Each structure stands twice: as C-alpha cells, then as structure tokens.
C-alpha cells in the first residue's frame, strides 16, 4: 500500500514548508511520496532559487518530493478559485492507492501516516464501506482544537453523522477538520472541491460532498495535526476583514445552504442562524475595528441581499 501525500503551498515561506517536509521525513511509515502544488506564478529564475533551497537540504524526503509549478506542469497560476482549484489539481495528480491531504502550515508526529492507514483498514473492514479518516486540528503547539464548523451535538450544523471511536470522544473532538483528510484515492475522487465555494469552508463542503456519496466520516482525537497558522486579527479569522472577504462569506453561506441542507435546516438557517451570525459579526466589527465598523456591516448586508436574489433565481455568477 502506497500513499500520495498532497499539499498546496503559496511557496512564499520556504521555512514553513521545510518544517512541514521535516515532519514527513520523520515518518515511521516510508512507502509514500509527496506532491506539492506551488500556487504562484514562478519565473524560471525564481523557481530555480526555490528548488535549490530544498535540494540543498539534507533530507531523504526531498528525493520523494515533486513540486508542481506553472513551468513544469499544466497548473494555471492565474486561476480565480483559490484553494478549491489547487486542491482539485493536486488530487488529480495523486498516483497511488491512498491520498493524504495536508496544508503547508501543518506538521504531524512520526506515527501519523501509519496510524491513519491502520485506522482506515480497521474501520473499513468493520463497516464494509468507504470511509474517510479525519484528525483533530490543533492551533500551533497548544491544546486548542481548531477544527472547522461542526459541533457533534449541534443539530443546526451537524449535517453529517460523524462516526466516533467512543462516546467520550464527542467531548474531545467537538468538530471535524478539512486538514489532514486520509482515504483511498478512489474514495476522495468521488467528489470535487466546489470552485465557487472557493476560499471559505471549501474543506467543509468537500467533506460533506463525500458524506453524500455514502462515505463514512471518522474523527479521531488521537490523530493530531498541528496547524502553524499565521497571526490573524479577529476580523480576519471571521473573514470580514475586507470587502472581498465579506462578499465571499455571504456568497458561501447561501451556496452551502442550498447545496447541502434539508428543509428543516434551511428554515433554521434563515430564521435563526443567519440573523444571529449577522448580529455577532456586526458586534465583532464594532469591537475590533470601530473606525470601519459601519463599512463592514454595510458590506455584509449588501452581499447578503445580492446573493439571496441571485442564488434563489439560480443566477450565481463568478465575478
């Protein structure tokens, strides 16, 4: 059994990417290669300098790492769809039986790949169906779980049934992560990242799409991915720091809801969740950026109104 470890990178922080590769170099399980998609437009001289930095490292893993760039592959550096395009590209390039998805700001312990493979074998055999192994995502070197969106016991957002190892795990793993997904290549290729849900919640949408293909989602508290996220202020974390972020956030709310939720959840979204989110984000804007809070709230309401009209008319545009 061989694993394709795939990762997207802006390729603008070589030390961060090197840290990620070092954590892979220490893996006990060795039958894998690494595909890194460089999400930027390299000139030939820039690419040469970039590659020299990694080739000069005394790491065995470099011999099993392939960097996809705009110069050596059909990758389009002028794409409009951010992470979704990059992730579809890297999944399409994976060659082996299993795929492990990472971001370049992740690190893992030496047993991570071995544990993922073992858990996949056990739970696929027990349930006799396709399954996806999902880790716990930790913020830097802390005990703060940073997984995305879902609470296991929150009906409003817990659309997928998360299959947990033990009932106590629901208190340890409150949410699941799009970082660190592991499964067979044939399973992960059953769905694609939605290139309209491009920058916010694209991992969540992808995992939900797998679930809708009758794939079981297994979350493990003992599978730990460390997320070395750059420093962000509160409004960047909420994705309302700029006009374009507010636009994409409002768009994704409606796209995601229309795509995945049932009628009961749709009513909860419109009458409970959406109003609460608007109030909460407006409060954040006033507290954390009082000089520009009015503009932020105006952006939110403007785009919520526009996406409501367009999506309900099935006229979603991509500009």
Identify the role of each PLM range.
Residues 22-31:
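Short, acidic, metal-binding catalytic loop of nucleotide-sugar glycosyltransferases
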Residues 72-94:
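Glycine-rich, basic loop-to-helix element that forms the pyrophosphate-binding segment
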Residues 99:
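Short aromatic/hydrophobic "clamp" motif used to bind/position activated sugar donors
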Residues 175-183, 187-191, 197-223:
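A short, conserved alpha-helix in the catalytic core of glycosyltransferases
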Residues 220-240, 253-256:
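Active-site donor/metal-binding and catalytic loop motifs
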Residues 243-252, 263-319:
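Non-catalytic, C-terminal membrane-associated alpha-helical segments of glycosyltransferases
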């Amino acid at each position: 059994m061989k694993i394709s470890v795939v990762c997207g990178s802006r390729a603008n922080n070589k030390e961060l990417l090197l840290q990620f590769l070092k954590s892979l170099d220490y893996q006990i399980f060795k039958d894998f290669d690494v595909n890194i998609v460089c999400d930027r437009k390299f000139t030939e001289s820039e690419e040469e300098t970039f590659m020299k930095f990694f080739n000069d490292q005394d790491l065995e893993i470099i011999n099993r790492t392939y960097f996809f760039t705009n110069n050596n592959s059909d990758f389009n550096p002028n794409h409009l769809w951010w992470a979704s395009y990059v992730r579809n590209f890297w999944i399409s390039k994976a060659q082996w039986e299993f795929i492990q998805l990472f971001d370049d700001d992740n690190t893992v312990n030496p047993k991570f790949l071995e544990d993922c493979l073992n858990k996949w074998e056990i739970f696929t055999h027990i349930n006799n169906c396709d399954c996806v192994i999902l880790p716990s995502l930790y913020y830097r070197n802390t005990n703060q779980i940073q997984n995305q969106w879902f609470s296991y016991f929150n009906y409003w957002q817990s659309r997928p049934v998360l299959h947990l190892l033990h009932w106590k795990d629901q208190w340890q793993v409150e949410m699941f992560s799009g970082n660190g997904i592991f499964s067979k290549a044939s399973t992960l290729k059953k769905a694609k990242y939605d290139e309209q849900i491009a920058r916010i919640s694209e991992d969540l949408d992808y995992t939900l799409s797998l679930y809708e293909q009758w794939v079981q989602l297994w979350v493990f508290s003992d599978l730990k991915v460390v997320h070395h996220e750059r420093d962000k202020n509160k409004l960047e974390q909420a994705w309302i720091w700029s006009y374009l972020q507010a636009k994409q956030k409002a768009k994704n709310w409606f796209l995601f809801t229309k795509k995945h939720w049932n009628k009961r959840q749709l009513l909860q979204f419109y009458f409970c969740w959406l109003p609460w989110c608007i109030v909460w984000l407006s409060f954040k804007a006033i507290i954390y950026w009082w000089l520009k809070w009015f503009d932020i709230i105006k952006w939110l309401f403007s785009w919520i109104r526009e996406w409501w009209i367009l999506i309900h008319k099935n006229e979603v545009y991509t500009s």
